[in-house]
């Protein structure tokens, strides 16, 4: 109850520091610029301030939602009301029906452009617009795929990926690829992840390690693999079960001592 009260209070608190802006910042133009499969968002205020953001690669499929579901709502609005706008846009045009990545990526693209505009106006980094700077430097981890490959090839590709740059952390995929396959009954080779986990830890004792199952396991399977991750000192287990199966997520989290993370499509 205490933890929930703290979370509720944090959610109710304002995020953007509106006091930094004395007069309205009216969004006069919102553009989505395209070069091939790459997109930029550019916003301008009525007073000529400008902000730019780089869109996620999936904008090539989601740009109609940006143009029809998000852009019209924000045009003419005061950017100082960003907190409220990010909530009310879900009501506009029944946008809540597109919750998750479908709406989240176009919306985040515009949000970043607006924050860039406000940051340029004040000369402040975004961290100073929405809070305080806690970490002047952020470590970068190497995310890898390869879960559809046989064990030895998977492990080799992970090592090759790490050799490209100096990383202090690594994320591996466990479970099995549930997309990009026509086989409706595709299953992970028995014992593959169970063998991969200690192989990676033994090879990289100095690295911070993460594991992502992309929702492959049921509760029992996730707990079993999670305990192997714990034994090998992995820092967190991402999407052990389907991201919207909240009771299953809780069951896994309660059974493990390590942190359990949910995915980017969950809002």
Roles of regions detected by a PLM:
Residues 8-56:
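Structured beta-strand/loop patches that form or line metal/cofactor-binding pockets in enzymes
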Residues 38, 63, 245-249:
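Short, well-ordered alpha-helical microsegments
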Residues 136-256:
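Metal-dependent enolase-superfamily TIM-barrel catalytic cores that perform enediolate-based chemistry
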Residues 27, 48, 70, 110, ...:
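Conserved, mostly hydrophobic/aromatic
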Residues 111-149:
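Glycine-rich, aromatic-flanked loop segments that form ligand/cofactor-binding clefts
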Residues 46-121:
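Metal- or metallocofactor-binding catalytic centers and their adjacent structured scaffolds
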Residues 240-244, 262-267:
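A general structural motif
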Residues 1-7:
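N-terminal export leaders
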């Amino acid at each position: 109850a205490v933890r929930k009260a703290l979370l509720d209070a944090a959610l109710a608190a304002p995020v953007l520091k509106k006091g930094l802006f004395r007069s309205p910042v009216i969004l006069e133009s919102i553009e989505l610029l395209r070069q091939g499969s790459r997109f930029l968002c550019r916003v301008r205020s009525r007073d000529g301030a400008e902000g730019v953001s780089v869109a996620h690669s999936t904008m090539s499929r989601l740009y109609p939602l940006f143009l029809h579901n998000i852009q019209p709502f924000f045009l003419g609005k005061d950017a100082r009301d960003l907190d409220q706008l990010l909530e009310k846009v879900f009501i506009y045009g029944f946008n809540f029906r597109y919750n998750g990545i479908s709406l989240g990526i176009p919306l985040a693209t515009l949000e970043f452009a607006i924050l860039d505009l406000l940051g340029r106006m004040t000369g402040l980094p975004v961290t100073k617009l929405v809070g305080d700077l806690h970490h002047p430097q952020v470590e970068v981890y190497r995310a890898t795929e390869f879960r559809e490959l046989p064990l030895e090839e998977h492990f080799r590709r992970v090592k090759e990926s790490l050799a490209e740059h100096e990383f202090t952390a690594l994320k591996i995929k466990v479970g099995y690829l549930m997309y990009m396959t026509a086989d409706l009954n595709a299953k992970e080779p028995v014992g593959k992840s169970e063998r991969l986990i200690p192989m990676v830890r033994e090879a990289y004792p100095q690295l911070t390690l993460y594991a992502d199952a992309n929702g492959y396991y049921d509760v029992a399977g996730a707990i079993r693999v999670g305990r192997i991750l714990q034994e090998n000192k992995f820092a967190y287990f991402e999407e052990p079960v389907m991201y919207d199966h909240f009771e299953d997520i809780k069951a896994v989290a309660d059974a493990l001592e390590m942190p359990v993370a949910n995915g980017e499509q969950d809002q």
